[in-house]
């Protein structure tokens, strides 16, 4: 897994410098097109900016093992949407989603979220529990984060 994106070829194709974006994540579990990611430095959890795989879904995991967000990427390898969990210090204390990387737009809250996104969220949460991602994250932190 590359940095805030998945590969040098996409970085170069999009005209982005790969220097700042390499090596930020490790996949701790893969299920089909869904990758569960941990940030290598154990710091702030941000979703990758882009993906090398069209339609990829990344689930970013916080250092404490909880889900930070679920992000899907479009045919141009850029973020299509993200479904985010609330966290301490966040003004938004409920599950919500953002479409693309547009800033300044209000999030869509769970009650107004289209059913297909709710279904994706529920599928990811089920896989998270089924594969013991919380425990895998804790093991990852013991081995990799200083």
Predicted segments — roles?
Residues 2-146:
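Catalytic toxin/effector domains delivered as secreted proteins or via bacterial secretion systems
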């Amino acid at each position: 897994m590359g940095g805030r994106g998945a590969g040098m070829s996409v970085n170069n194709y999009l005209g982005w410098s790969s220097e700042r974006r390499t090596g930020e994540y490790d996949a701790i579990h893969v299920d089909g097109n869904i990758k569960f990611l941990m940030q290598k430095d154990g710091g702030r959890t941000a979703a990758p900016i882009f993906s090398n795989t069209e339609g990829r879904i990344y689930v970013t995991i916080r250092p404490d093992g909880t889900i930070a967000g679920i992000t899907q990427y479009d045919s141009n390898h850029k973020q299509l949407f993200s479904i985010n969990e609330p966290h301490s210090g966040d003004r938004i204390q409920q599950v919500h989603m953002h479409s693309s990387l547009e800033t300044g737009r209000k999030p869509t809250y769970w009650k107004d979220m289209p059913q297909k996104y709710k279904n994706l969220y529920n599928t990811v949460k089920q896989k998270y529990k089924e594969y013991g991602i919380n425990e895998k994250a804790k093991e990852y932190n013991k081995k990799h984060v200083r």
